[in-house]
C-alpha cells in the first residue's frame, strides 16, 4: 500500500471496448492526481473491469476479483459482469462497489469513497493529450459507440450495454487526431456494430476537422483516411452499406481488409441466431469485392454446435468455408450464456460433437489459410513493427490486426523500433504467420491508408 500519493491499480479483462472503458477511467483518475500502478502491493485500491459474455469469461472475472481481494483487499468492480444482478456480491461480498459497463462516474465515486482524492490543482498537463493507454504507444483503440440494436439469440450484450448510442463524429475524429499527434500509427475502431454507426442519430452531418462529415461508417472512414495512419474498423455487421467502402479500397484510400463476423452459413441456423441469412448473396458480394479489390483480406468468425445444429447444417457451413476461401477465420464452440435466448431454442449439441465439428472446421480452414500464406512467399509487403527482442522484430502486415491475426517475424530486424513501418520480403510461412527480411534502406515513413477490420 502507498503511504504518500493515493494510488490505484486496475485489471482490465474482456474485449477492446472494455479496454477503452478502463483507459477512460484511468485518464480521469490521473487528471485528479491519483498515482497509477500495476502492482497489487503498491495500490491503495484495485479496480477490476470484468467480462460477463460467456461462462468462461465470468469465471475468469470472478477468479481475478478473488485474486485482487487476496493480494490487496480493497477491490472495486465494474464492467459487464457487474450488470448481472448479485452475481459478484454472492461470490465476493467484501468488494467495495459494483457497477456495470461504461459506468465511469460510479467507478470514480467508489474510488473517491475508498481513497480520498489528493489535494492538488488539477492542471491539464498531468495527463498526456491522448489520455492513459493500456496498449503499446504505436496503436490505440478508438470506441465510436456504445451498445447494440441487434438481438442475436446467442448474445446478451444489449442487456448489459443497452441499445446503440453513437458518439458525435466530431468527437471521434478529434480524438483520433490527438492520438495521431501523440505518435499513434494505427487506430483500431471498436464498437458492438460499426456498420450501424450513426443510425441512432439518423446519420446526421456535423463538422469534423473543419469539414461537413456524415455520422456513418463511410463518413467516419473517409474522415479518418485524411489522418495518414492505419485505421481498422472492427465488428462490421454484414449490412448492404459495407458495399460503400469497397470502392474506397479499390481507389487505394482504404486498406484491403474487412472484418465481417458471419457466425454461420446455414439459413435455418442463421434464422435461429437472428442473423442475416442470405448465404448466396454473401458469396456473391465476396466474389464482387475480390473482383474490385484482388488483394482483399476478409476476416470472419463462426460458431459451431449452436443448439439444434444438425450434421447437414454443419456441412453447409463447411461448404461455405470451402467456397468463400476466407483469409482470416476464428471459430468458437457454442457456449451457453446465462440469459441468452438460444439456450432454449433446441436441444443442445453434445460437447463431444461440438469438439469434433470444431476440429473438422479448423482442419479445413487451416489448409485454406496455409495455401493463402504460402502464396505470399517472395512478395514484398509493408509491415508495422510491434516489438523487437534478441531474436529480431515482430511485426504485422496490413492484413493483420493485433492479437487476433498473424504476425510477421523479421529475424534481421534488430535495428527496427516498435512503431516503424518497413518494407520486407517474405521468405517463409505457416498457417498463420510469415517470416521476412527487410528490403532496401530502412526509412521511417508515413502511410495514408485506413484499415477496415
From Swiss-Prot:
SUPFAM superfamilies: Radical SAM enzymes. Residues 374-440 form the TRAM domain. [4Fe-4S] cluster 2 binds at residues 148, 152, 155. Keywords: 4Fe-4S, Cytoplasm, Iron, Iron-sulfur, Metal-binding, S-adenosyl-L-methionine, Transferase. Its cofactor is [4Fe-4S] cluster. GO terms for molecular function: 4 iron, 4 sulfur cluster binding; aspartic acid methylthiotransferase activity; metal ion binding; protein methylthiotransferase activity. One of its GO terms (cellular component) is cytosol. It is an enzyme of class 2 (transferase). Residues 6-116 form the MTTase N-terminal domain. InterPro entries: Elp3/MiaA/NifB-like_rSAM (IPR006638), Methylthiotransferase (IPR005839), Methylthiotransferase_CS (IPR020612), Methylthiotransferase_N (IPR013848), Methylthiotransferase_N_sf (IPR038135), NA-bd_OB-fold (IPR012340), Ribosomal_uS12_MeSTrfase_RimO (IPR005840), rSAM (IPR007197). GO terms for biological process: tRNA modification. Its EC number is 2.8.4.4. Its main location: cytoplasm. [4Fe-4S] cluster 1 binds at residues 15, 51, 80. Gene3D superfamilies: Methylthiotransferase, N-terminal domain (3.40.50.12160), Nucleic acid-binding proteins (2.40.50.140), tm_1862 like domain (3.80.30.20). Binds 2 [4Fe-4S] clusters. One cluster is coordinated with 3 cysteines and an exchangeable S-adenosyl-L-methionine. Residues 134-371 form the Radical SAM core domain. It catalyses: L-aspartate(89)-[ribosomal protein uS12]-hydrogen + (sulfur carrier)-SH + AH2 + 2 S-adenosyl-L-methionine = 3-methylsulfanyl-L-aspartate(89)-[ribosomal protein uS12]-hydrogen + (sulfur carrier)-H + 5'-deoxyadenosine + L-methionine + A + S-adenosyl-L-homocysteine + 2 H(+). It is found in: Cytoplasm. Catalyzes the methylthiolation of an aspartic acid residue of ribosomal protein uS12. Belongs to the methylthiotransferase family. RimO subfamily. This is Ribosomal protein uS12 methylthiotransferase RimO. It comes from Hydrogenovibrio crunogenus (strain DSM 25203 / XCL-2). The gene is rimO.
Amino acid at each position: 500500500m502507498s503511504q504518500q500519493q493515493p494510488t490505484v491499480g486496475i485489471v482490465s479483462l474482456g474485449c477492446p471496448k472494455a479496454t477503452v472503458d478502463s483507459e477512460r477511467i484511468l485518464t480521469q483518475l490521473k487528471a485528479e492526481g491519483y498515482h497509477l500502478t500495476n502492482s497489487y502491493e503498491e495500490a491503495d485500491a484495485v479496480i477490476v473491469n470484468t467480462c460477463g459474455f460467456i461462462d468462461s469469461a465470468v469465471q475468469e472475472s470472478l477468479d481475478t476479483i478473488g485474486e485482487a481481494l487476496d493480494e490487496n483487499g480493497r477491490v472495486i468492480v465494474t464492467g459487464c459482469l457487474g450488470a448481472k444482478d448479485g452475481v459478484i456480491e454472492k461470490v465476493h461480498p467484501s468488494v467495495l462497489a459494483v457497477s456495470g459497463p461504461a459506468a465511469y462516474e460510479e467507478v470514480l465515486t467508489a474510488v473517491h469513497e475508498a481513497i480520498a482524492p489528493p489535494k492538488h490543482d488539477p492542471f491539464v498537463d498531468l495527463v498526456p493529450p491522448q489520455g492513459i493507454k493500456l496498449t503499446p504507444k504505436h496503436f490505440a483503440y478508438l470506441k465510436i459507440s456504445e451498445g447494440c440494436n441487434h438481438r442475436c439469440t446467442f448474445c446478451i450484450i444489449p442487456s448489459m450495454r443497452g441499445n446503440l448510442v453513437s458518439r458525435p463524429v466530431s468527437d471521434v475524429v478529434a480524438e483520433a487526431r490527438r492520438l495521431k499527434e501523440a505518435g499513434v500509427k494505427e487506430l483500431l475502431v471498436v464498437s458492438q456494430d460499426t456498420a450501424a454507426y450513426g443510425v441512432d442519430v439518423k446519420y446526421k452531418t456535423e463538422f469534423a476537422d473543419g469539414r461537413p462529415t456524415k455520422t456513418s461508417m463511410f463518413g467516419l472512414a473517409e474522415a479518418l483516411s485524411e489522418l495518414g495512419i492505419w485505421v481498422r474498423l472492427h465488428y462490421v455487421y454484414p449490412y448492404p452499406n459495407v458495399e460503400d467502402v469497397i470502392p474506397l479500397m479499390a481507389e487505394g484510400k482504404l486498406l484491403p481488409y474487412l472484418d465481417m463476423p458471419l457466425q454461420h452459413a446455414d439459413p435455418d441456423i442463421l434464422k435461429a441466431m437472428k442473423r442475416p441469412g442470405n448465404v448466396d448473396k454473401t458469396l456473391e458480394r465476396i466474389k464482387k469485392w475480390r473482383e474490385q479489390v484482388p488483394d482483399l483480406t476478409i476476416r470472419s468468425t463462426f460458431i459451431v454446435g449452436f443448439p439444434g445444429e444438425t450434421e447437414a447444417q454443419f456441412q453447409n457451413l463447411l461448404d461455405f468455408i470451402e467456397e468463400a476461401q476466407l483469409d482470416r477465420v476464428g471459430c468458437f464452440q457454442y457456449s451457453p450464456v446465462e440469459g441468452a435466448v438460444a439456450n432454449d431454442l433446441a436441444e443442445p449439441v453434445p460437447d463431444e460433437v461440438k469438439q469434433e465439428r470444431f476440429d473438422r472446421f479448423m482442419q479445413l480452414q487451416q489448409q485454406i489459410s496455409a495455401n493463402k500464406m504460402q502464396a505470399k512467399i517472395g512478395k514484398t509487403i509493408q509491415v508495422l513493427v510491434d516489438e523487437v527482442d534478441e531474436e529480431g522484430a515482430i511485426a504485422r502486415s496490413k492484413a493483420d490486426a493485433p492479437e487476433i491475426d498473424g504476425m510477421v517475424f523479421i529475424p534481421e530486424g534488430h535495428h527496427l523500433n516498435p512503431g516503424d513501418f518497413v518494407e520486407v520480403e517474405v521468405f517463409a510461412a505457416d498457417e498463420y504467420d510469415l517470416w521476412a527480411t527487410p528490403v532496401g534502406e530502412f526509412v521511417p515513413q508515413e502511410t495514408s491508408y485506413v484499415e477496415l477490420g
